[in-house]
A protein has these predicted regions:
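Short beta-strand/loop motif that positions the catalytic acidic residue
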Residues: 233, 239-241
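Conserved HGGG/HGGXW glycine-rich cap/lid loop of the alpha/beta-hydrolase fold
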Residues: 53-106
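Active-site nucleophile elbow and catalytic-triad environment of alpha/beta-hydrolase enzymes
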Residues: 213-229
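Catalytic active-site module of serine/aspartate enzymes centered on a nucleophile-bearing elbow/loop
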Residues: 272-319
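Alpha/beta-hydrolase fold catalytic core
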Residues: 2-3, 8-12, 17-68, 93, ...
Length: 319
């Protein structure tokens, strides 16, 4: 019984992401560039028609500017609105697209089960509907898995990827996380902020039990991406996890290595002569939920990656 209460508490706490996203998390020091900027406001909102389904989207900045946009993918039980802490820092540097995944937010319930392949198809469909030929992709949790699947299946549509607390294989999660997800029911969330937020946003507020069931089934299914397929992803990858994340650190490290991390030549010479193919960041004292309070830090780490900024060598070390 105590174990079930602990699982329920973990999930209900995740609901606070949606509530806190609109006002930022307390106790987090924001960078000067983000502090000086106002909370990003979408330049356009609407619905994208994708194969008979309608997906709510938000865009920031000018998609026709010629600069590759960043597609932001939210996690389970969340919405594009809940990703505001991450969007803020990126929207001052590039166009940003966010949308509500099937069953979530203002998109609402759609027929059929959830699969990561379908979610990747949906994301590409939104890009096509917005006439965006390709985008860099940042995904958190469920969105991180979707970003990996997108990069494997649609190499021409996906530029760089920022995988935040996401995996390429189901066993990348700790077993306890998978066990917890297998036990969720609509009753787990009864009266929780998460359920209330869903009903506030959704055009199908009565479908919350269906959302819970579809997410539970999606997380129980096999969505593993073969190591060879991950290694073959064309563009660069950054992996960001917390040191107390639901993602196993061994998996994050393996994903980093598969994507070209661990440059032994650079290790031997002591510096990176050019921007690497893969980057790995492990945030200290940070959990799977807590990483959403690190929006400014995530953008500060990710923007140089997206811009292919060459790592700095301190003066006095090279001729």
């Amino acid at each position: 019984m105590a174990r079930r209460r602990k699982i329920a508490s973990w999930l209900i706490v995740s609901a606070a992401i949606s509530i806190l996203a609109g006002c930022g998390a307390p106790g987090v020091e924001r960078s000067q560039s983000v502090t000086d900027a106002r909370r990003a406001v979408p330049d356009k909102t609407g619905y994208a028609d994708v194969n008979g389904a309608r997906f709510y989207f938000q865009t920031y900045g000018d998609l026709g500017s010629g600069k590759r946009p960043l597609l932001v993918l939210h996690g389970s039980f969340m919405s594009s609105e809940a990703m505001a802490p991450l969007i803020d820092g990126f929207a001052v540097t590039r166009p940003v697209i966010a949308f509500d995944a099937r069953g979530h937010g203002r998109t609402g319930d759609l027929q059929g089960p959830f699969t990561y392949a379908q979610m990747a198809d949906d994301a590409v469909g939104v890009l096509n509907a917005l006439k965006v030929p390709s985008a860099d992709v940042l995904g958190y949790s469920m969105g991180g898995v979707t970003a990996v699947v997108m990069a494997v299946r649609f190499p021409d549509k996906v530029g760089k990827q920022v995988i935040v607390s996401g995996v390429s294989r189901r066993d990348g999660w700790y077993p306890e996380v998978l066990q917890g997800m297998a036990r969720i029911t609509p009753e787990t969330f009864a009266g929780s902020p998460l359920e209330k937020e869903y009903k506030r946003l959704s055009p199908t507020p009565e479908a919350f039990p269906a959302l819970v069931g579809k997410i539970r089934e999606q997380e129980a299914a096999d969505y593993d991406q073969a190591d060879e397929a991950v290694r073959a992803i064309q563009n660069k990858t950054m992996i960001i996890v917390g040191d107390a994340d639901g993602v196993q650190l061994d998996h994050a490290l393996k994903l980093f290595m598969l994507r070209g991390g661990g440059d032994r030549k650079a290790a031997a010479q002591g510096f990176l002569p050019e921007a690497p193919r893969a980057r790995l960041a492990v945030l200290p004292a940070t959990s799977h939920i807590g990483i959403m309070a690190s929006g400014p830090l995530i953008s500060e780490l990710s923007i140089p990656f997206l811009d292919d900024t060459k790592p700095v060598v301190p003066p006095g070390f090279l001729k």
